[in-house]
């Protein structure tokens, strides 16, 4: 006999007596269904059970659906049977646990496997092991030691990358002697070089923050017990003076905006477009660079393609080294290209940069292309510019009151 299994939205319309509920929007749906004596499969994204979510710092991981990191530890530490269900003796209604792996941004089988392993191994253990028997430290040791079994079967899998606290970036700008700190999402050996050569398992072992005083290149990777290494990260360290502000008088609020119709995949195509640029006034909110799309744009049909440029000045509040992040096609400051996402899937960004800026006004230009790359419509992206001083922990969006034009 057939029996219905449905996502937890079916709770909203009343359940047939034999319906099984898949609780994906947290655990509340599963608890509610079990209280009604319905069987449940637990699969909440909040429990690290969506394998298409990032498993490391999204600023250096391959692009996938925008999401908070679902580290291996998060998946492993998920407990499928909520305490509420245990206290009521309704454990029998929790049939099991499931991971999901949506594939919109998995363009190859290798990428699919990379997202699945080793978190699918954690899924097996949380499904079969009593909570009191679980030990993440021991699990991680076994995963790392037995990765050779995956290698023998030519299975791609995730090896945690060396990450920087508060957001990884392949460019580090300094104005004085400092240190560069790295960490991994679980305890792992890291090796590095400072002479431009590619590190090997026998290279210097990272044991403390790396001292930097001038221009140099850090190459760093993690190493498994087998000697297999992660992708090597290359971090360019550059000593800069604060770029001077410009002296501009009689400025007005906002950036000057212009648009041009057409389907553009490269910024230089704007220079050879047949259409004419249209003056669109001024904007203080960068999302206003976008235009409203037809109702069926969510299905990726009927979109109005165009390019847009907003330019003027940005007011930097104080001297400092600033880390920059944006999903714009390009961002220019002081007539220098500081962020370049050209051709990238804008679901995420691996193009963060850093620059030393003096307090005051600096020329700025934002380039936006309304197109679809890798299945991601660029109009889904938030077009803000985020900045973080090197002594701050969080990025914040630049406020509209910081933009000016002549």
Describe the residue ranges of each PLM region:
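Histidine/acidic-residue-rich catalytic or RNA/ligand-binding cores of hydrolases
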Residues: 15-16, 51-59, 109-113
């Amino acid at each position: 006999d057939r029996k219905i299994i449905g996502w937890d939205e079916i709770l909203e319309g009343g359940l047939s007596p034999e319906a099984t509920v898949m609780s994906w929007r947290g655990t509340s749906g599963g608890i509610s269904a079990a209280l009604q004596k319905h069987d449940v499969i637990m699969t909440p994204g909040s429990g690290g059970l969506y394998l298409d979510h990032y498993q490391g710092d999204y600023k250096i991981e391959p692009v996938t659906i925008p999401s908070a990191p679902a580290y291996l530890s998060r998946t492993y530490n998920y407990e499928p049977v909520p305490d509420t269900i245990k206290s009521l003796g309704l454990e029998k209604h929790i049939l099991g646990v499931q991971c999901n792996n949506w594939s919109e941004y998995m363009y190859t089988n290798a990428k699919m496997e990379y997202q699945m392993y080793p978190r699918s191994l954690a899924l097996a253990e949380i499904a079969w092991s009593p909570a009191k028997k679980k030990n993440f430290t021991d699990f991680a040791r076994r995963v790392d030691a037995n990765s050779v079994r995956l290698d023998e079967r030519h299975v791609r899998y995730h090896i945690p990358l060396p990450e920087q606290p508060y957001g990884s970036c392949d460019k580090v700008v300094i104005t004085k002697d400092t240190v560069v700190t790295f960490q991994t999402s679980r305890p792992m050996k890291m090796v590095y070089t400072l002479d431009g050569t590619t590190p090997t398992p026998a290279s210097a072992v990272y044991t403390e923050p790396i001292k930097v005083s001038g221009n140099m290149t850090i190459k760093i990777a993690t190493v498994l017990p087998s000697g297999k290494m992660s992708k090597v990260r290359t971090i360019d360290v550059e000593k800069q003076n604060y770029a001077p502000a410009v002296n501009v008088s009689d400025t007005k609020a906002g950036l000057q905006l212009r648009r041009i119709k057409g389907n553009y995949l490269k910024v230089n195509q704007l220079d050879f477009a047949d259409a004419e640029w249209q003056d669109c006034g001024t904007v203080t909110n960068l999302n206003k660079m976008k235009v409203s799309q037809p109702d069926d744009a969510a299905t990726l049909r009927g979109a109005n393609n165009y390019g847009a440029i907003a330019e003027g000045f940005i007011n930097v509040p104080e001297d400092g080294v600033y880390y920059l992040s944006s999903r714009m096609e390009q961002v220019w400051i002081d007539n220098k290209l500081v962020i370049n996402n050209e051709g990238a899937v804008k679901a995420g960004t691996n193009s963060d940069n850093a620059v030393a800026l003096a307090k005051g006004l600096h020329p700025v230009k934002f380039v936006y292309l309304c197109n679809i790359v890798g299945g991601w419509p660029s109009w889904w992206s938030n077009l803000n510019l985020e900045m973080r001083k090197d002594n701050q922990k969080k990025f914040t969006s630049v406020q509209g009151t910081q933009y000016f034009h002549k």
